[in-house]
Amino acid sequence: MHALHQTLLPSSSIHHSLFLPHFTPSTIYPLPKPPAALDTLDVKVIGNLVVAGAEVLRVFEIREESVPIIENVKLEEDVAEGEKDVQMEEVGDGFFDDGHAERAPLKYQTTRRLHLLTQHELNGTITGLAATRTLESTIDGLDRLIVSFKDAKMALLEWSRGDIATVSLHTYERCSQMNTGDLQSYVPLLRTDPLSRLAVLTLPEDSLAVLPLIQEQSELDPLSEGFSRDAPYSPSFVLSLSDMSITIKNIQDLLFLPGFHSPTIALLFSPMHTWSGRLQTVKDTFCLEIRTFDLSSGTSYPLLTSVSGLPSDSLYLVACPSELGGIVLVTSTGIVHVDQGGRVTAACVNAWWSRITSLKCSMASVSQKLTLEGSRCVFVTPHDMLLVLQNGAVHQVRFSMEGRAVGVIEVLDKGCVVPPPSDLTVAGDGAVFVGSAEGDSWLAKVNVVRQVVERSEKKKDEMEVDWDEDLYGDINDAALDEKAQELFGPAAITLSPYDILTGVGKIMDIEFGIAASDQGLRTYPQLVAVSGGSRNSTINVFRRGIPITKRRRFNELLNAEGVWFLPIDRQTGQKFKDIPEAERATILLSSEGNATRVFALFSKPTPQQIGRLDGKTLSAAPFFQRSCILRVSPLEVVLLDNNGKIIQTVCPRGDGPKIVNASISDPFVIIRRADDSVTFFVGDTVARTVAEAPIVSEGESPVCQAVEVFTDTTGVYRTFEPSKSESSEPISHQIDSENKPNITNGINGTTARSARQTQLTPQQIKRLQEQEPAITTEAPSMETAINSPHGTQWLALVTRGGELQIRSLPDLQIVLQSEGLASSAPSFTDDLGENPGYVLGEKREEGEEEDEIIQMVFCPIGKGTVRQHLLALHHSGRLNAYEAQPRFTVDASSHSRRSLAVRFRKVHTQLLPISGGVGTTNGNARLPYTIVPFNNIEGLTGAFITGEKPHWIISSEAHPLRAFALKQAAMAFGKTTHLGGKGEYFIRIEDGSFICYLPPTLNTDFAIPCDRYQMERAYTNITFDPTSAHYVGAASIEVPFQAYDEEGEIQLGPDGPDLIPPTNQRSTLELFSQGSDPWKVIDGYEFDQNEEVMSMESVNLESPGAPGGYRDFIAVGTGFNFGEDRATRGNTYIFEILQTVGPQGGGGPGSVPGWKLVKRTKDPARHPVNAVNHINGYLLNTNGPKLYVKGLDYDSQLMGLAFLDIQLYATTVKVFKNFMLIGDLCKSFWFVSLQEDPYKFTTISKDLQHVSVVTADFLVHDGQVTFISSDRNGDMRMLDFDPTDPDSLNGERLMLRTEYHAGSAATVSKVIARRKTAEEEFAPQTQIIYATADGALTTVVSVKDARFKRLQLVSDQLVRNAQHVAGLNPRAFRTVRNDLLPRPLSKGILDGQLLNQFALQPIGRQKEMMRQIGTDAVTVASDLQALGGFW
């Protein structure tokens, strides 16, 4: 059997973060400004933030903007009688302000937000991020990024053509340190020199991979022959730290220090190990050395400072600002400062310091009783450092100076709380980023409050002379610190959120269930994931698609094929305070068959029909500032008044071809007929008439396959002014072009000083901005100037030959020509008429069938800050979404016409399923697809695609574009506000026509929509009881650890006032409510001291009193943590959820009575019960090295039936029919069966390899079964039971077929089944869902042989032909190292992440790859669509 592994939910955990001042051009050049905001403050990009977790790399802009402060000056009940609300309507006919309205002045506050630029899933696990600048940075002014990966790899990346581009990849996986070193304890550390002269990566066996970076042109001359002179680096090499000093062993941390002429590195290492039982004789084993890399001499590493005798619990180093100097060493019990002369100053934060080290310290902060394991530190002022603990508590660390040295280190009380940190970095001036692997991350504002202190003059004796002060001046002089110390005292620092980056975090457990709101015949399973863990948990309720939440039926539109809710200005319309006049729907057009009905909308639920028009409606929109309606039918174009009456026939009926589609944007209209001819109309606002206008001044109008006229309100659509090389200075086009000119004076020349700057100066930024081509900002006409808040208007045409033309309105001048849209290129810009063919796509051959574009929509998509997108729907059902990104420089050296300053970058692509087979197209489908844009539905702006498989196309500012499917076909869609709700929309589905709304709790930031609930406790397990439809969770509470001896007597440990007591976990069982107020604890059960829940499942056991003889119970396996001096044990519990009978409302506030958790039995065990399950009505539970099957006798006690001795320690038990897979901690898994007469376990087969199994599951497909296991390293293995194979030892050994590296280690797995009928007891096909420690959800589905062979060939083509980010090989990433095999077993599981790259390739490249393997692109896309799983 074969399988496909793909990602359902990418990882959102953040392990590494990095701030880059100038990584993208938007940090140098000003952003486009919306026309409606010309008089407001600019939005400024202060820098870029790069975050990484697992295999996901994301790049953000940090945008600083001013937002109004909303103040409720008057309440509604305080408004005097007769006083009307003043509403600011959009500019229309009467755009002159009468001046009588009283307006309160707006107050603004400055905030910063994260704006996502790009996101990639790489073919490697990211282990570090570092910033650098190369020789090219002196030309374009941009920073570069270095990313390190698992298996000792470094990639140098830069920003080019609107995305990340790979400069080089450096691999060290074949060096001797990686082949023979100890990889188990290897922790890769990536560091770069502050002046970008060196990058190092730690390797096993105390070695460094060194990459010298070139910063001056003169450094290119001494390069060795054969090395590329264009490379921004010198040849890298591997340095053994023993060459520096033989005492350097066991590197704990290292970092480069700022302010040195040569690269200077600080090394923290421990030549000798110690442990807690050896502290009486050996302590203070760590050493700190500061050495210089002398690159000129090659092998010289001078020692500057050496300090020994540092605490043995040292954790990491923090570089100090130049004003403070030195290095901060963080230990688990205190903070140590080491200056450049080797002077040590320390402060302890708990009383364990004196038991661990003999180093003298300040005891002023010992009462804080902090634990610094897992903490993160960063300096925010020259003398103040923020210390963020593992639980998110923020403490300020103040360094007080005594002369020129640090005198006192003071750790202040907790100031605030942030998410549990995995990384902490400074994100510009006055901000830090707190990255978390357990959930949401913060972009936080640093609040610095200083107390005013009056400076007292100190009188000196005339005879008292300080010679140093006489020579160098008073070191306490306020002039040295810009009078800060004179006016202000010590700072009090706290953090507050600027922006929150949502994330799932580590997933502890998952469970499938049915929502209580699902009623009737249609029930959709939901996946509940428990994430978080260290402080509290988050309940994430995932659904595949956005749920249809119905408010009321709309029976008047039962047969509607298309609806238009229009905000027409009518006196009888109902006004709502929270809905702007421009969004208030007053007229409804419903196209039904060969007629169109016109309705007037009021606040009443039932609309009033006021007219009827002949023919179906293709398009309708408000016209002439919402005073009229323009309607397009297949035969005519008419102008209607605000009551739906015809006032002008714009395009009368004729014998010509029918109109097939149209686009309207007041005052422009364009129609396309069946023969692909187009007609353009322009409305006269004064005369209230619409007339035809020619598109081209000479010749015939172009023949087009798609047309669109649209309005841009974001300001992104701008144009470059024409320029000629002979009449103007050469313009540096280094940022966007591939061939960068050799400009030596890019930033004040390439001097050593400018090349080694870490950040651009304002003068350098101004010089780069002056090189920018002129961009059109003025309004092209008087009419657009008057209506500037409405935005600029543009006309887009896709000719029959596949060329996209964008023309500015109203002058109809071409500003963009490109074939990139028709060829599905990854990105495209204006070709400027210089390239006859598109660079990234191949020209179509003669006789080759064309995949035409049948609909093209330019619309904003986003939440809060919207982005302009281009949606293109092809004839085959292919949907491409392009984001319109601003450009700041042109690719060509000269251009004779205006050029659109926009780059269209593909951000999403998919194939919409069409019934009827592969050859069916959208044009002849049963229900064709149509793109319907919408605006502001619960704050979301995007598009909805009606058809056989409807989709929502939405996005948010900090997350990529998402496409969420619906389970039912949709015939019509439209946003409405006539009932007073902002989040309401009309939809006609198979169940009928409804007014629906988006739930306010719905989160659409992730790849799967979900509802999120923040819990007060941390939860480790969750399960669903199908009988009561309730969830049960196991909470983990941190309590002081209590040690017991073998007789059960309490043992006392070390005692002291400031000693931190040891803690452990104690579990409780909690029953959650359902319905309108879900996830409230309504009942529970507390376990004993030191007892933790190890496993929990919903089991179906025999129960004589139940209907059918079976009943659902909750089985819980626990274990006791008694410490290392006493043997552990466990218990098996059986609980049942019962509905209470009696008076309701007996609970406390907020409780939901009616259900309770009842304990049926408790069965003691000699070992922890790590796994429970059920089989044929019996309970399965592990007990250390044994497996038991038990029956529930009279619902009150467990009766043992059979047992099986297994290898070492069972971790998982999975059941299919009467077969079981028992996973072991060290010995892989067994394949076992159970017989009932007599009760007996039978071992069928075993896996003989030593693998630490985390999950083991059955994968079933049409009578065949295979076994899929995953281990702690994230490796997935597929094994078969094949007695006919000679190597299987007559079936006693399971045969290994495939090894596949899945990335992050799985924490839990669930198997779901696809049953063709409800009567099928056992599944003919299964799907495995995995949850990982990095917050990802992945899946494995089976693949038929013919489809697998085809997709395997596609994968081979993609490995060779697709461009992979960072230059990583996807095949090498998925290969598992196994020394027992002569060659890797890499075939058998397809890489879904790699296959998803197929849809992103240009059409020409797709056809070329498919021609080599004898298939077509539509067949491959259909295969991938069919393998999407059944959840």
Swiss-Prot record:
Superkingdom, taxonomy of origin: Eukaryota
Segments carrying the region annotation (Disordered) are 721-759
Q: What does the entry give for GO biological process? A: mRNA processing
- Record keywords, A-Z: mRNA processing, Nucleus, RNA-binding
Instruction: Tell me which Pfam families the record gives.
Output: Beta-prop_RSE1_1st, CPSF_A
Where mainly found?
Answer: nucleus
Which molecular function term from Gene Ontology is one that the record holds?
RNA binding
Which InterPro entries does the record cross-reference, listed alphabetically?
Beta-prop_RSE1/DDB1/CPSF1_1st, Cleavage/polyA-sp_fac_asu_C, RSE1/DDB1/CFT1/CPSF1, WD40/YVTN_repeat-like_dom_sf
Compartments where found:
Nucleus
Q: Which GO terms describe its cellular component?
A: mRNA cleavage and polyadenylation specificity factor complex; nucleus
Entry function? RNA-binding component of the cleavage and polyadenylation factor (CPF) complex, which plays a key role in polyadenylation-dependent pre-mRNA 3'-end formation and cooperates with cleavage factors including the CFIA complex and NAB4/CFIB. Involved in poly(A) site recognition. May be involved in coupling transcription termination and mRNA 3'-end formation.
Descriptive protein name: Protein CFT1
GN (gene name):
CFT1
